[in-house]
């Protein structure tokens, strides 16, 4: 190889080396430039752009920094959606964040907030559907579920009392088992069948005495007299009045006195001719069916029930509270007894412990109108109190049999229990609530 050739090869080698160095220097310069730009993108908040470069050329730490910031932005956007009431979008956004900070908890919070909004808007069925997605132990879930169920219960109750039966059945089915919903659903379905079939015995073809009484009409029925307001509504109450005697057909003039007194209660009232003393359950069933017929014809759903009984009718009255609750789910609000026959000595006619339990569960208040000396010394009353019944002795100054009844009629007692006035507080009455430690009044 000549000297000239060697020089040429050396020059080529040097040129190639310079080119290589220049290339790698340029490449490194570009990388440094791009890295600087990626950092600037990150600093400027373009985490997606920065991550794109870091994914090709950066470190895992750089990528993790971008991922965190991207998740943080998504978290803040989801929080803004939640604050704006966009509950479904916010929940999906939080769920997409997986285990980022408390995103999983916030996703559940979206469910709770949506249920809260639906409950506040009265959309209780939808609220309960939403709440079903929450764990039972989630903070606030049980309380809100109870609130929504109670709201739906009241909606169903309103539809029931207003005799919107198809709607009521739908609402009761949506609610499921809650309080007395099962029995109310059964009664609504029975009412729908009755509405389609009509009543067995119409009560309104023969008005008693052929004239109106106050704001209502007194109708004849084979079991007694039925007073019906001319304008019934969802607030119309119901009352059964059992007379005294040993199941003999007595003059019923003092039943009518309450109506003729001009009070005109918003209540359907059945004045029974007899008290069924010798066949109490059968008589109660007959009374219920007669009252249900009257209610059906006047588009009233039996509720807010009051039952009264004089003398031996007192035994039928107290039994009515347990019977109606057990068989029809009807909670009798008040039972009023007036001078119970034989001073509660007919122990085979009084409530059993099991019946007392039913009346206590129904929340029935027993008001026993008596003269002096009647109270916990009577085994019938003692059993009722011992088994949780709400019993009050109403000690009457006018303690004669008819005096007790007339005072209740003319001094506002029936008005009060039928929602038309205040509880009488005059000197004629002394109210003595009983508990297991009570003694009988002297």
What are these regions (language model features)?
Residues 186-236, 426-442:
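A domain-start/cap signature at the N-terminus of enzymes
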């Amino acid at each position: 190889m000549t000297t000239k050739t060697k020089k040429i090869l050396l020059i080529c080698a040097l040129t190639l080396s310079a080119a290589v160095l220049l290339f790698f220097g340029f490449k490194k310069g570009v990388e440094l430039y791009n890295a600087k730009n990626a950092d600037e993108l990150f600093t400027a908040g373009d985490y997606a752009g920065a991550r794109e470069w870091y994914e090709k050329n950066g470190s895992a730490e750089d990528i993790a920094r971008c991922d965190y910031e991207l998740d943080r932005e998504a978290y803040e956007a989801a929080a803004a959606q939640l604050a704006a009431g966009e509950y479904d979008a916010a929940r999906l956004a939080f769920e997409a964040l997986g285990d980022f900070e408390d995103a999983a908890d916030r996703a559940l919070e979206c469910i709770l907030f949506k249920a809260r909004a639906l409950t506040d808007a009265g959309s209780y069925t939808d609220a309960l559907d939403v709440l079903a997605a929450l764990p039972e132990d989630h903070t606030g879930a049980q309380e809100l579920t109870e609130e929504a169920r109670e709201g739906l219960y009241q909606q169903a109750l309103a539809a029931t009392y207003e005799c919107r039966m198809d709607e009521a059945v739908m609402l009761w089915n949506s609610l499921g088992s809650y309080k007395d919903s099962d029995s109310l659903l059964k009664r609504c379905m029975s009412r729908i069948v009755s509405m389609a079939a009509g009543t067995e015995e119409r009560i309104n073809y023969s008005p008693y005495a052929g004239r109106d009484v106050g704001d209502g009409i007194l109708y004849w029925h084979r079991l007694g007299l039925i007073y019906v307001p001319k304008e019934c509504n969802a607030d119309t109450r119901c009352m059964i009045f059992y007379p005294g005697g040993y199941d003999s057909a007595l003059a019923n003039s003092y039943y009518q006195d309450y109506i003729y007194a001009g009070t005109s209660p918003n209540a359907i009232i059945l004045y029974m001719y007899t008290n069924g003393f010798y066949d109490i359950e059968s008589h109660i069933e007959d009374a219920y069916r007669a009252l249900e017929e009257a209610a059906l014809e006047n588009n009233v759903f039996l509720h807010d029930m009051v039952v009264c009984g004089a003398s031996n009718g007192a035994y039928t009255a107290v039994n009515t509270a347990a019977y109606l609750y057990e068989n029809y789910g009807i909670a009798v609000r008040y039972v009023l007894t007036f001078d119970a026959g034989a001073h509660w000595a007919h122990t085979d006619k009084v409530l059993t412990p099991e019946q007392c339990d039913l009346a206590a569960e129904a929340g029935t208040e027993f008001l026993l109108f008596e003269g002096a000396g009647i109270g916990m010394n009577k085994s019938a009353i003692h059993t009722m109190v011992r088994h949780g019944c709400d019993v009050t002795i109403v000690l009457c100054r006018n303690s004669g049999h008819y005096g007790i009844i007339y005072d209740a009629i003319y001094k506002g007692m029936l008005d009060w229990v039928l929602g038309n006035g205040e509880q009488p507080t005059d000197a004629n009455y002394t109210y003595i609530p009983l508990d297991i430690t009570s003694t009988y009044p002297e």
